[in-house]
Amino acid sequence: MNPHVDDKRAVILIGHGSRAAGADDDMEKIAAGLREKSGGIVETCRMSGRGISFTKAFERCVGRGAEEIIVLPYFLHFGIHLREDIPEILRTAARRRPEIRLVLGRHLGYDDALVNLLAKRIGESEGLCDVRKITPAPIDRRMKDTPEEKQP
């Protein structure tokens, strides 16, 4: 498969984003893979307000000559961000830049490839230790409801 992305047609991956260091790395790796596969313009942005905003990613694509931008939601579930928030963000951008064709692609959702990936993860889990033997990482400690540290 060779996705058609070039100097006139760009892709923006839009994800939720996270405050946890390194949590967004996988989306960046996916974007890098798409860039390598297509040789075209591929940007990322996040809904969380951390990292690059959609507006910034959109303007980067336009600044590089894109006339069409495909926005691919990096989400598994068809929740509020996909039903309401992202379409509104795109409508705002389309009003601001009517000369740019703006397309909202499908979210990750269901795909047989995802079933195969989960089956692979089940296989990889064989031989891993029980969770009771894992020392909590600093972020895991925040999830405990103790008198010293309440859940956020």
Task: Give, region by region, the residue ranges found by the protein language model.
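Active-site-proximal alpha-helix that buttresses catalytic centers in soluble enzyme cores
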Residues: M1-P152
